[in-house]
Protein backbone atom coordinates (compact mmCIF):
# COMPACT_ATOMS: atom_id res chain seq x y z
CA UNK A 1 0.00 0.00 0.00
CA UNK A 2 1.46 3.37 -1.06
CA UNK A 3 1.75 6.13 1.48
CA UNK A 4 0.72 9.66 0.54
CA UNK A 5 3.68 11.88 -0.43
CA UNK A 6 4.37 15.14 1.28
CA UNK A 7 4.97 18.31 -0.73
CA UNK A 8 8.70 18.18 0.09
CA UNK A 9 9.04 14.64 -1.19
CA UNK A 10 7.01 15.54 -4.26
CA UNK A 11 9.35 18.49 -4.97
CA UNK A 12 12.37 16.30 -4.51
CA UNK A 13 11.03 13.75 -6.95
CA UNK A 14 10.10 16.41 -9.55
CA UNK A 15 12.45 19.39 -9.18
CA UNK A 16 11.56 20.89 -12.57
CA UNK A 17 7.87 21.06 -11.93
CA UNK A 18 8.29 22.89 -8.67
CA UNK A 19 7.66 26.28 -10.15
CA UNK A 20 4.69 25.19 -12.25
CA UNK A 21 2.84 23.66 -9.39
CA UNK A 22 3.94 26.03 -6.72
CA UNK A 23 0.61 27.73 -6.50
CA UNK A 24 -1.39 24.53 -6.26
CA UNK A 25 1.07 22.93 -3.87
CA UNK A 26 1.11 25.93 -1.63
CA UNK A 27 -2.69 25.98 -1.45
CA UNK A 28 -2.79 22.26 -0.75
CA UNK A 29 -0.14 22.60 1.90
CA UNK A 30 -2.04 25.35 3.57
CA UNK A 31 -5.06 23.08 3.75
CA UNK A 32 -3.33 19.91 4.83
CA UNK A 33 -0.42 21.15 6.97
CA UNK A 34 -1.47 23.26 9.89
CA UNK A 35 0.48 26.33 10.77
CA UNK A 36 2.63 26.03 13.85
CA UNK A 37 1.41 27.97 16.81
CA UNK A 38 3.46 29.31 19.60
CA UNK A 39 2.53 29.36 23.19
CA UNK A 40 4.01 31.71 25.63
CA UNK A 41 4.86 30.53 29.07
CA UNK A 42 5.63 33.05 31.74
CA UNK A 43 8.22 31.99 34.10
CA UNK A 44 8.79 33.64 37.40
CA UNK A 45 12.29 32.30 37.85
CA UNK A 46 13.98 33.87 34.75
CA UNK A 47 15.27 37.32 34.39
CA UNK A 48 13.13 39.82 32.66
CA UNK A 49 10.38 37.27 32.22
CA UNK A 50 11.85 35.52 29.21
CA UNK A 51 9.04 33.92 27.19
CA UNK A 52 9.75 30.54 25.71
CA UNK A 53 7.92 29.53 22.52
CA UNK A 54 7.38 25.84 21.71
CA UNK A 55 5.92 24.75 18.35
CA UNK A 56 2.74 22.54 18.55
CA UNK A 57 1.66 20.42 15.56
CA UNK A 58 -2.12 19.87 14.98
CA UNK A 59 -3.09 16.74 13.02
CA UNK A 60 -6.21 16.80 10.87
CA UNK A 61 -7.74 13.44 9.93
CA UNK A 62 -9.27 13.24 6.49
CA UNK A 63 -13.04 12.68 6.50
CA UNK A 64 -14.77 9.83 4.74
CA UNK A 65 -15.08 10.48 1.05
CA UNK A 66 -12.10 12.92 0.89
CA UNK A 67 -9.32 12.00 -1.45
CA UNK A 68 -5.67 12.75 -1.44
CA UNK A 69 -5.29 13.12 -5.13
CA UNK A 70 -6.29 16.76 -5.35
CA UNK A 71 -9.84 16.11 -6.68
CA UNK A 72 -13.13 17.70 -5.61
CA UNK A 73 -13.78 17.17 -1.95
CA UNK A 74 -17.63 16.39 -2.15
CA UNK A 75 -19.88 14.27 0.13
CA UNK A 76 -20.98 10.91 -1.38
CA UNK A 77 -24.86 10.50 -1.27
CA UNK A 78 -26.35 7.43 0.49
CA UNK A 79 -27.28 4.44 -1.70
CA UNK A 80 -30.92 4.33 -3.05
CA UNK A 81 -33.49 2.39 -1.10
CA UNK A 82 -36.36 0.33 -2.71
CA UNK A 83 -39.88 1.74 -2.70
CA UNK A 84 -42.12 0.67 0.10
CA UNK A 85 -44.31 -2.31 -0.92
CA UNK A 86 -42.48 -2.77 -4.22
CA UNK A 87 -41.74 -6.45 -3.67
CA UNK A 88 -45.13 -7.29 -2.14
CA UNK A 89 -47.91 -8.85 -4.23
CA UNK A 90 -51.05 -6.80 -4.67
CA UNK A 91 -54.64 -8.01 -4.24
CA UNK A 92 -56.17 -10.43 -6.72
CA UNK A 93 -57.88 -8.77 -9.69
CA UNK A 94 -61.21 -10.37 -8.86
CA UNK A 95 -61.10 -9.11 -5.27
CA UNK A 96 -60.04 -5.61 -6.34
CA UNK A 97 -62.81 -5.37 -8.95
CA UNK A 98 -65.37 -6.67 -6.47
CA UNK A 99 -64.30 -4.02 -3.96
CA UNK A 100 -64.62 -1.29 -6.58
CA UNK A 101 -68.04 -2.58 -7.58
CA UNK A 102 -69.31 -2.62 -3.98
CA UNK A 103 -67.77 0.77 -3.11
CA UNK A 104 -69.26 2.45 -6.18
CA UNK A 105 -72.13 4.68 -5.07
CA UNK A 106 -73.85 4.37 -8.44
CA UNK A 107 -74.57 0.68 -7.82
CA UNK A 108 -75.98 0.95 -4.30
CA UNK A 109 -79.44 -0.03 -5.51
CA UNK A 110 -78.06 -3.33 -6.82
CA UNK A 111 -75.08 -4.12 -4.57
CA UNK A 112 -73.79 -2.22 -1.54
CA UNK A 113 -72.25 -2.65 1.87
CA UNK A 114 -74.32 -4.47 4.45
CA UNK A 115 -76.85 -2.67 6.63
CA UNK A 116 -75.72 -1.27 9.95
CA UNK A 117 -72.77 0.75 8.65
CA UNK A 118 -70.17 -1.75 9.87
CA UNK A 119 -68.86 -2.45 6.38
CA UNK A 120 -67.99 -6.04 7.27
CA UNK A 121 -70.19 -7.53 4.52
CA UNK A 122 -71.86 -6.62 1.25
CA UNK A 123 -75.35 -7.47 -0.02
CA UNK A 124 -76.56 -8.18 -3.55
CA UNK A 125 -80.06 -6.72 -3.53
CA UNK A 126 -81.00 -7.61 -7.14
CA UNK A 127 -79.11 -10.57 -8.67
CA UNK A 128 -80.82 -10.18 -12.07
CA UNK A 129 -79.89 -6.51 -12.36
CA UNK A 130 -76.36 -7.32 -11.19
CA UNK A 131 -75.92 -9.94 -13.89
CA UNK A 132 -77.50 -7.77 -16.58
CA UNK A 133 -75.88 -4.38 -16.02
CA UNK A 134 -73.16 -4.39 -13.36
CA UNK A 135 -71.07 -7.53 -13.89
CA UNK A 136 -70.28 -6.78 -17.57
CA UNK A 137 -68.76 -3.44 -16.50
CA UNK A 138 -66.23 -5.01 -14.13
CA UNK A 139 -65.82 -8.59 -15.41
CA UNK A 140 -65.80 -10.42 -18.72
CA UNK A 141 -69.01 -12.34 -18.02
CA UNK A 142 -72.59 -11.71 -16.97
CA UNK A 143 -73.27 -14.87 -14.97
CA UNK A 144 -74.32 -14.45 -11.34
CA UNK A 145 -73.71 -18.13 -10.53
CA UNK A 146 -70.12 -17.85 -11.74
CA UNK A 147 -69.66 -14.73 -9.59
CA UNK A 148 -70.90 -16.58 -6.48
CA UNK A 149 -68.63 -19.54 -7.29
CA UNK A 150 -65.61 -17.23 -7.46
CA UNK A 151 -66.57 -15.65 -4.14
CA UNK A 152 -66.56 -19.11 -2.55
CA UNK A 153 -63.17 -19.78 -4.12
CA UNK A 154 -61.69 -16.68 -2.45
CA UNK A 155 -63.06 -17.55 0.99
CA UNK A 156 -66.24 -15.47 1.07
CA UNK A 157 -69.10 -17.00 3.04
CA UNK A 158 -72.82 -16.38 2.94
CA UNK A 159 -73.90 -14.64 6.14
CA UNK A 160 -77.71 -14.52 5.85
CA UNK A 161 -79.60 -17.49 4.37
CA UNK A 162 -82.59 -15.46 3.13
CA UNK A 163 -80.58 -12.99 1.03
CA UNK A 164 -77.31 -12.78 -0.92
CA UNK A 165 -75.04 -11.32 1.78
CA UNK A 166 -71.33 -12.25 1.74
CA UNK A 167 -68.46 -11.48 4.11
CA UNK A 168 -64.71 -11.98 4.48
CA UNK A 169 -62.37 -11.06 7.32
CA UNK A 170 -60.17 -8.93 5.04
CA UNK A 171 -62.96 -7.43 2.91
CA UNK A 172 -63.88 -4.32 4.92
CA UNK A 173 -65.17 -0.91 3.90
CA UNK A 174 -62.44 1.77 3.83
CA UNK A 175 -59.59 -0.73 4.35
CA UNK A 176 -58.47 -1.50 0.85
CA UNK A 177 -54.94 -2.36 1.98
CA UNK A 178 -56.29 -5.56 3.56
CA UNK A 179 -57.40 -6.97 0.21
CA UNK A 180 -53.93 -8.44 -0.36
CA UNK A 181 -54.63 -10.90 2.47
CA UNK A 182 -57.48 -12.52 0.52
CA UNK A 183 -55.96 -15.46 -1.30
CA UNK A 184 -57.44 -17.99 -3.65
CA UNK A 185 -58.03 -21.40 -2.16
CA UNK A 186 -55.72 -24.06 -3.50
CA UNK A 187 -56.76 -27.68 -3.75
CA UNK A 188 -54.36 -30.14 -2.17
CA UNK A 189 -52.36 -32.33 -4.51
CA UNK A 190 -53.69 -35.72 -3.29
CA UNK A 191 -57.24 -34.51 -3.79
CA UNK A 192 -56.43 -33.32 -7.30
CA UNK A 193 -54.80 -36.64 -8.13
CA UNK A 194 -57.82 -38.57 -6.87
CA UNK A 195 -60.17 -36.37 -8.89
CA UNK A 196 -58.07 -36.89 -12.01
CA UNK A 197 -58.08 -40.63 -11.47
CA UNK A 198 -61.84 -40.64 -11.01
CA UNK A 199 -62.33 -38.63 -14.19
CA UNK A 200 -60.02 -40.93 -16.12
CA UNK A 201 -61.81 -44.02 -14.86
CA UNK A 202 -65.18 -42.56 -15.79
CA UNK A 203 -63.95 -41.55 -19.24
CA UNK A 204 -62.46 -44.93 -20.06
CA UNK A 205 -65.29 -46.85 -18.35
CA UNK A 206 -63.01 -48.59 -15.86
CA UNK A 207 -64.18 -48.90 -12.23
CA UNK A 208 -61.87 -48.10 -9.37
CA UNK A 209 -62.03 -51.40 -7.48
CA UNK A 210 -63.48 -54.92 -7.92
CA UNK A 211 -65.91 -54.26 -5.09
CA UNK A 212 -67.45 -51.46 -7.08
CA UNK A 213 -67.94 -53.84 -10.01
CA UNK A 214 -69.85 -56.24 -7.76
CA UNK A 215 -72.03 -53.45 -6.36
CA UNK A 216 -72.77 -52.15 -9.86
CA UNK A 217 -73.79 -55.61 -11.04
CA UNK A 218 -76.05 -56.03 -8.00
CA UNK A 219 -77.68 -52.66 -8.60
CA UNK A 220 -78.17 -53.50 -12.26
CA UNK A 221 -79.88 -56.80 -11.41
CA UNK A 222 -82.15 -55.06 -8.89
CA UNK A 223 -83.10 -52.40 -11.42
CA UNK A 224 -83.80 -55.02 -14.07
CA UNK A 225 -86.08 -56.96 -11.67
CA UNK A 226 -87.90 -53.77 -10.76
CA UNK A 227 -88.41 -52.92 -14.44
CA UNK A 228 -89.85 -56.39 -15.12
CA UNK A 229 -92.22 -56.07 -12.15
CA UNK A 230 -93.37 -52.65 -13.32
CA UNK A 231 -94.02 -54.02 -16.80
CA UNK A 232 -96.14 -56.82 -15.35
CA UNK A 233 -98.12 -54.37 -13.25
CA UNK A 234 -98.63 -52.18 -16.30
CA UNK A 235 -99.93 -55.09 -18.37
CA UNK A 236 -102.29 -56.17 -15.57
CA UNK A 237 -103.64 -52.65 -15.16
CA UNK A 238 -104.07 -52.34 -18.90
CA UNK A 239 -106.04 -55.59 -19.13
CA UNK A 240 -108.23 -54.57 -16.18
CA UNK A 241 -108.88 -51.22 -17.81
CA UNK A 242 -109.88 -52.88 -21.09
CA UNK A 243 -112.24 -55.26 -19.25
CA UNK A 244 -113.77 -52.38 -17.33
CA UNK A 245 -114.32 -50.39 -20.52
CA UNK A 246 -116.01 -53.39 -22.13
CA UNK A 247 -118.23 -53.87 -19.08
CA UNK A 248 -119.22 -50.20 -19.12
CA UNK A 249 -120.09 -50.43 -22.80
CA UNK A 250 -122.23 -53.53 -22.17
CA UNK A 251 -124.05 -51.84 -19.31
CA UNK A 252 -124.73 -48.76 -21.43
CA UNK A 253 -125.96 -50.96 -24.28
CA UNK A 254 -128.30 -52.87 -21.92
CA UNK A 255 -129.63 -49.62 -20.50
CA UNK A 256 -130.33 -48.25 -23.96
CA UNK A 257 -132.05 -51.49 -24.94
CA UNK A 258 -134.16 -51.47 -21.77
CA UNK A 259 -135.20 -47.88 -22.28
CA UNK A 260 -136.06 -48.56 -25.92
CA UNK A 261 -138.01 -51.68 -24.98
CA UNK A 262 -140.19 -49.90 -22.42
CA UNK A 263 -140.66 -46.93 -24.73
CA UNK A 264 -141.91 -49.21 -27.49
CA UNK A 265 -144.13 -51.14 -25.06
CA UNK A 266 -145.76 -47.91 -23.90
CA UNK A 267 -146.20 -46.53 -27.40
CA UNK A 268 -147.27 -49.78 -29.12
CA UNK A 269 -149.16 -52.44 -27.08
CA UNK A 270 -148.85 -54.91 -29.98
CA UNK A 271 -145.07 -54.89 -29.65
CA UNK A 272 -145.14 -57.46 -26.81
CA UNK A 273 -147.29 -59.80 -28.87
CA UNK A 274 -144.92 -59.41 -31.79
CA UNK A 275 -141.95 -60.30 -29.57
CA UNK A 276 -143.76 -63.35 -28.24
CA UNK A 277 -144.61 -64.48 -31.75
CA UNK A 278 -140.99 -64.15 -32.79
CA UNK A 279 -140.00 -66.14 -29.74
CA UNK A 280 -142.48 -68.90 -30.63
CA UNK A 281 -141.40 -69.02 -34.25
CA UNK A 282 -137.73 -69.18 -33.33
CA UNK A 283 -137.66 -71.68 -30.50
CA UNK A 284 -140.98 -73.50 -30.98
CA UNK A 285 -143.03 -75.08 -28.28
CA UNK A 286 -141.34 -77.87 -26.34
CA UNK A 287 -144.18 -80.22 -25.51
CA UNK A 288 -147.92 -79.92 -25.25
CA UNK A 289 -147.82 -79.03 -21.59
CA UNK A 290 -145.62 -76.03 -22.22
CA UNK A 291 -147.81 -74.90 -25.13
CA UNK A 292 -150.88 -75.24 -22.96
CA UNK A 293 -149.35 -73.18 -20.16
CA UNK A 294 -148.43 -70.43 -22.61
CA UNK A 295 -151.96 -70.38 -24.03
CA UNK A 296 -153.41 -70.18 -20.54
CA UNK A 297 -151.10 -67.30 -19.71
CA UNK A 298 -152.18 -65.44 -22.86
CA UNK A 299 -155.87 -66.02 -22.18
CA UNK A 300 -155.65 -65.15 -18.50
CA UNK A 301 -153.35 -62.16 -18.89
CA UNK A 302 -155.79 -60.01 -16.88
CA UNK A 303 -155.13 -62.09 -13.76
CA UNK A 304 -151.98 -61.12 -11.92
CA UNK A 305 -149.65 -64.03 -11.06
CA UNK A 306 -148.74 -62.23 -7.89
CA UNK A 307 -152.34 -62.37 -6.76
CA UNK A 308 -152.47 -66.06 -7.71
CA UNK A 309 -149.47 -66.72 -5.53
CA UNK A 310 -151.04 -64.89 -2.61
CA UNK A 311 -154.34 -66.80 -3.05
CA UNK A 312 -152.47 -70.11 -3.27
CA UNK A 313 -150.62 -69.28 -0.08
CA UNK A 314 -153.88 -68.46 1.74
CA UNK A 315 -155.50 -71.70 0.46
CA UNK A 316 -152.48 -73.67 1.69
CA UNK A 317 -152.73 -72.14 5.14
CA UNK A 318 -156.49 -72.84 5.28
CA UNK A 319 -156.26 -76.48 4.09
CA UNK A 320 -153.36 -77.53 6.28
CA UNK A 321 -154.60 -78.59 9.73
CA UNK A 322 -152.46 -79.26 12.82
CA UNK A 323 -153.16 -83.03 12.72
CA UNK A 324 -152.80 -83.64 8.99
CA UNK A 325 -149.69 -83.60 6.86
CA UNK A 326 -151.19 -82.04 3.69
CA UNK A 327 -148.19 -83.01 1.59
CA UNK A 328 -150.07 -83.19 -1.72
CA UNK A 329 -151.58 -79.74 -1.41
CA UNK A 330 -148.35 -78.18 -0.31
CA UNK A 331 -146.42 -79.82 -3.13
CA UNK A 332 -148.93 -78.58 -5.68
CA UNK A 333 -148.81 -75.04 -4.41
CA UNK A 334 -145.01 -74.97 -4.34
CA UNK A 335 -144.39 -76.37 -7.81
CA UNK A 336 -146.79 -74.16 -9.78
CA UNK A 337 -145.32 -70.70 -8.96
CA UNK A 338 -141.82 -72.06 -9.46
CA UNK A 339 -142.68 -73.28 -12.95
CA UNK A 340 -144.29 -69.98 -13.89
CA UNK A 341 -141.31 -67.97 -12.68
CA UNK A 342 -138.85 -70.20 -14.51
CA UNK A 343 -140.83 -69.90 -17.73
CA UNK A 344 -140.97 -66.13 -17.41
CA UNK A 345 -137.23 -65.97 -16.73
CA UNK A 346 -136.52 -68.05 -19.85
CA UNK A 347 -138.84 -65.86 -21.84
CA UNK A 348 -137.06 -62.69 -20.65
CA UNK A 349 -133.73 -64.14 -21.71
CA UNK A 350 -135.16 -64.88 -25.10
CA UNK A 351 -136.56 -61.36 -25.26
CA UNK A 352 -133.05 -59.98 -24.72
CA UNK A 353 -131.78 -62.17 -27.50
CA UNK A 354 -134.58 -60.98 -29.75
CA UNK A 355 -133.72 -57.37 -28.98
CA UNK A 356 -130.10 -58.00 -29.87
CA UNK A 357 -131.04 -59.81 -33.08
CA UNK A 358 -133.70 -57.42 -34.40
CA UNK A 359 -132.34 -54.46 -36.39
CA UNK A 360 -133.56 -51.00 -35.65
CA UNK A 361 -135.15 -50.44 -39.03
CA UNK A 362 -137.19 -53.66 -38.83
CA UNK A 363 -138.47 -52.79 -35.39
CA UNK A 364 -139.53 -49.35 -36.59
CA UNK A 365 -141.36 -50.89 -39.55
CA UNK A 366 -143.15 -53.32 -37.24
CA UNK A 367 -144.18 -50.42 -35.03
CA UNK A 368 -145.57 -48.54 -38.00
CA UNK A 369 -147.43 -51.60 -39.22
CA UNK A 370 -148.88 -52.25 -35.78
CA UNK A 371 -149.96 -48.67 -35.36
CA UNK A 372 -151.62 -48.62 -38.77
CA UNK A 373 -153.62 -51.80 -38.17
CA UNK A 374 -155.38 -50.51 -35.03
CA UNK A 375 -157.67 -47.57 -34.57
CA UNK A 376 -157.22 -45.20 -31.68
CA UNK A 377 -160.93 -45.39 -30.82
CA UNK A 378 -160.59 -49.07 -29.94
CA UNK A 379 -158.27 -48.25 -27.02
CA UNK A 380 -160.37 -45.42 -25.60
CA UNK A 381 -162.23 -46.47 -22.46
CA UNK A 382 -160.76 -49.99 -22.46
CA UNK A 383 -158.06 -50.88 -19.93
CA UNK A 384 -154.87 -52.40 -21.22
CA UNK A 385 -154.61 -56.06 -20.43
CA UNK A 386 -150.82 -56.25 -20.44
CA UNK A 387 -150.26 -53.76 -17.62
CA UNK A 388 -150.61 -56.41 -14.90
CA UNK A 389 -147.90 -58.55 -16.52
CA UNK A 390 -145.27 -55.79 -16.36
CA UNK A 391 -143.98 -56.76 -12.88
CA UNK A 392 -142.90 -60.12 -14.30
CA UNK A 393 -140.82 -58.27 -16.87
CA UNK A 394 -139.41 -55.80 -14.36
CA UNK A 395 -138.46 -58.21 -11.57
CA UNK A 396 -135.89 -60.23 -13.60
CA UNK A 397 -134.29 -56.98 -14.75
CA UNK A 398 -133.74 -55.37 -11.35
CA UNK A 399 -129.98 -55.85 -11.79
CA UNK A 400 -130.04 -52.92 -14.23
CA UNK A 401 -130.97 -50.52 -11.43
CA UNK A 402 -128.22 -51.85 -9.15
Swiss-Prot record:
UniProt keyword annotations, A-Z: Coiled coil, DNA-binding, Nucleus, Phosphoprotein, Stress response, Transcription, Transcription regulation
Xref: Gene3D superfamilies: Winged helix-like DNA-binding domain superfamily/Winged helix DNA-binding domain
Q: Does the keyword Coiled coil apply?
A: yes
Which terms under GO biological process does the entry name? cellular response to heat; regulation of transcription by RNA polymerase II
**What are the recorded GO MF terms, alphabetically?**
DNA-binding transcription factor activity; sequence-specific DNA binding
Fill in the PTM field for this protein: Exhibits temperature-dependent phosphorylation.
Chain segments annotated as coiled-coil in the UniProt record:
212-258
Region: Hydrophobic repeat HR-A/B, residue numbers: 216-266
Here the disulfide bonds are none
Q: Which PROSITE patterns match?
A: HSF_DOMAIN (PS00434)
Purpose of the protein: Transcriptional regulator that specifically binds DNA of heat shock promoter elements (HSE).
Q: How does it assemble?
A: Homotrimer.
**Protein name, please?**
Heat stress transcription factor A-6a
Identify the gene encoding this protein: HSFA6B
Amino acid sequence: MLKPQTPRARRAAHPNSHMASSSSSSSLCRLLIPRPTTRRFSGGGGEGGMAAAAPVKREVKPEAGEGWGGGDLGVVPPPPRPMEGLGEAGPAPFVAKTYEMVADAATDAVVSWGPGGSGASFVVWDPHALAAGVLPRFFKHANFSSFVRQLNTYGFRKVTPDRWEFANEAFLAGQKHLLKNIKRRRVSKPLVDSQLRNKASVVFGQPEAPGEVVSLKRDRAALRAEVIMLKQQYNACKSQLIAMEEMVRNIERRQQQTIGFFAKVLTNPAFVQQVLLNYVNKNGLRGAAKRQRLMENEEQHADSPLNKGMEAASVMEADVSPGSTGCGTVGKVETTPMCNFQNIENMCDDVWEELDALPETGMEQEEKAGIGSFDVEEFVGRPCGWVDDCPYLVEPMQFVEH
